[in-house]
Design a protein with these regions (language model features):
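Helix-loop-helix
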Residues: 85, 196-211, 280-353, 358-359
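Transmembrane helices of ABC transporter permease
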Residues: 49, 53-66, 77, 178-232, ...
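Transmembrane helix-loop-helix hairpins at lipid-water interfaces of multipass membrane proteins
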Residues: 36, 54-118, 199-203, 314-318
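An intracellular "coupling" helix at the cytosolic face of ABC transporter transmembrane type-1 domains
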Residues: 150-151, 169-176, 180, 188, ...
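ABC-type nucleotide-binding domain
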Residues: 2-5, 367-368, 374-621
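Hydrophobic alpha-helical transmembrane segments of ABC transporter permease domains
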Residues: 48, 106, 118, 122, ...
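Short intracellular "coupling" helices and adjacent cytoplasmic loop segments at the cytosolic face
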Residues: 26-31, 131, 139-163, 167-169, ...
């Protein structure tokens, strides 16, 4: 299918949203998944493909933690040796054994260096795993997009779909990289620290443990109150993005109708709700760290007092107090880190939930066994008692029937909402009929593979869709294996060659993202050249001249005549003057064909077509 591709109006091929721009749904810390446990299990299964790498991360993290946890205990021996030496020196019975202290310090340095090396290794492996997962997810989403039915995209904004590829995958990757590593190291640190604390003093360990239930209660309370505000924040952030997108995309209409103040007022109301929910959610979330720090300081005080009493009794050494206080710090720090990870895990799981929801969406059936080949289609098309509605409860096309011979030019006219474009969508199987049949060369279109079927069609739309690249590349999009000479011949047939050669760089001129360096009429000629190059058997032209001036329309009409020559063509037109030479004109109203015939026959009938035609010329006069 020669598809009309480019981003001049941020709209995609059938008038729907295009793939670029607009409304990103940004992830915020603390957003909660609808089904946390289910989504988290899916995420675990997904990363199961990297279980050996994750296992290596866990082993290296554990080894790093063991060496790190042993450090304070060894350092405490140096402090004890120094204190004992000072006491002996004061008592006159000896002095400080610097050799012993030096060996202890070297051992401590070795422990921390080894810990750092293993920490680096686990971080390096985990980063690789995370990026591979993100790469794989983006690839799967990209492939999924091409298998999605048209109804999915027409029911959602392109910003929402774009967010799955960018924000959600990035949030998942960052959360996975940081939270998994943090959970492993924090858990290993907690276990190691508890063991070392117990070897120093069970009593001091018991005092330090008193802070655990207090911390858990305070943390769960804060999380409980903050969750509802995080959800409101995320919801209204989406509203903000949507309003900004609408304001940007429709700024000309907004200015033309003097609606700037109304738009600002609406935005301010939404922004106010976002501000309030964001302030409360961030404030409550920000309380976690100071609360945990306060509880931790209480633990330090209890440990210091009890340790001092035990040292006076000679139960433990001075270095043991130093080591224990360091362990208390190392004990509370992982708890604080886990508290921070909770919000991160929620965001990560919520992001993965949306990604997996998208990947599990219903797909179009692309291929089936025994499919009919489109290699030698002639372009004969039949609509046989077709009924269709986007909503099952509301029929748009009612018992539609028509026979189209190969090479015929069929014009479809009627008021907005009559079902003209819907007929094209059914023909190309963007949607399937509710009942009836559409035949291509006497085969039901459902007997063809969708991809093969669409190769038989070329399209030129009102909303030109060019992409960032050279003019040569944009025309060649119709047939990627075309030579430069074939591209130029197609441009000549489309009456585009002359204006292309006047541009800086000619065919090699680079178009920007919205193709604003060429006029609307020139864009249309380029898309016609692309369709000519594709050389499809059936052409579809949907309001191709509705957005250009009369002079440009005449040029485009000549190009369209060249394009349609020898091909079955369906022309959806608003300007009836452009379809006077059609073999058959189908006049649609409310999903029904109310009249059909050629231009002269329909005028002679004096019916609905004649009213439309005469009204247009009265307006022109």
């Amino acid at each position: 299918m020669a598809e009309n591709k480019a981003g001049t109006s941020n709209r995609g091929p059938m008038g729907g949203r295009g793939p670029m721009g607009g409304g990103r749904r940004m992830m915020q810390g603390g957003e909660k998944a609808k089904n946390f446990s289910g989504s988290f299990k899916k995420l675990i299964r997904y990363i199961g493909n990297y279980k050996f790498a994750i296992l290596a991360v866990m082993i290296f993290a554990a080894i790093s933690t063991v060496f790190s946890v042993a450090g304070p205990k060894v350092m405490g021996k140096a402090t004890t040796a120094l204190a004992e030496g000072l006491m002996k020196k004061i008592a006159g019975t000896g002095g400080i054994d610097f050799t012993r202290i030096g060996k202890i310090l070297l051992l401590t340095l070795g422990l921390y260096l080894t810990s750092t090396v293993f920490n680096f290794l686990q971080g390096w492996i985990m980063t690789g795993v995370t990026q591979k997962i993100c790469y794989r997810l983006r690839k799967e989403i990209s492939e999924k997009i091409n298998r999605m039915p048209m109804k999915y995209f027409e029911s959602r904004t392109y910003g929402e779909v774009l967010s799955r590829i960018t924000n959600d995958v990035d949030t998942l990757g960052q959360g996975l990289n940081q939270s998994v590593t943090q959970v492993i190291t924090s858990t290993a640190t907690l276990i190691g620290v508890v063991v070392m604390m117990l070897t120093i003093s069970p009593l001091m360990t018991l005092i330090a443990f008193i802070i655990l239930p207090v911390s858990a209660i305070l943390m769960s309370t804060v999380v409980k109150f903050s969750q509802k505000y995080f959800r409101t924040q995320q919801e209204y952030l989406g509203h903000i993005n949507g309003q900004v997108e609408e304001s940007y995309g429709g700024h000309l209409v907004i200015k033309a109708f003097n609606k700037e103040k109304d738009m600002v007022k609406t935005f301010d109301e939404t922004n106010g709700v976002l501000y309030e929910s964001a302030w409360k959610s961030q404030f409550l979330s920000g309380l976690m760290q100071p609360i945990m720090a306060f509880v931790g300081n209480l633990g330090y005080a209890g440990v210091a007092i009890s340790g001092g009493l035990l040292a006076i009794r000679g139960t433990i050494g001075v270095g043991d107090i130093q080591a224990f206080i360091q362990y208390v710090k190392n004990f509370t720090q992982p708890i604080q880190q886990i508290a921070q990870v909770i919000n991160q895990v929620q965001s990560m799981t919520a992001a993965s939930e949306r990604v997996f929801e998208f990947l599990e969406e219903e797909e179009e059936d692309q291929e089936h066994e025994g499919a009919v080949s489109v290699e030698n289609v002639t372009g004969e098309v039949k609509f046989f008692h077709v009924n269709f509605g986007y909503n099952p409860n509301q029929t748009i096309i009612n018992d539609f029937s028509v026979d189209v011979k190969p090479g015929q030019k069929i014009a479809i006219v009627g008021p907005t909402g009559a079902g003209k474009t819907t007929m094209v969508k059914l023909l190309m199987r963007f949607y399937d009929v509710n009942s009836g049949q559409i035949l291509l060369d006497n085969h039901d279109v459902r007997d063809y593979n969708r991809r093969d079927l669409r190769k038989a069609f070329g399209m030129v739309l009102q909303d030109t869709w060019l992409y960032k690249g050279t003019i040569m590349e944009n025309i060649r999009y119709g047939r990627l294996d075309a030579t430069d000479e074939e591209v130029i011949e197609a441009a000549k047939a489309a009456h585009a060659d002359s204006f292309i050669r006047t541009l800086p760089g000619g065919y090699n001129m680079e178009l920007n993202e919205d193709a604003s360096t060429v006029s609307q009429g020139q864009k249309q000629l380029l898309t016609i050249a692309r369709a000519i190059l594709a050389d499809s058997k059936v052409m579809i032209l949907d309001e191709a001249t509705s957005s250009v001036d009369t002079r440009t329309e005449a040029l485009i009409q000549k190009a369209m005549d060249n394009l349609m020559e020898g091909r079955t063509s369906f022309v959806i037109a608003h300007r009836l003057s452009t379809i006077k030479n059609a073999d058959v004109i189908l006049v649609m109203k409310d999903g029904d064909i109310i009249e059909q015939g050629n231009h002269e026959e329909l005028l002679a009938k004096g019916g609905f077509y004649a009213q439309l035609y005469n009204s247009q010329f009265e307006e022109a006069a």
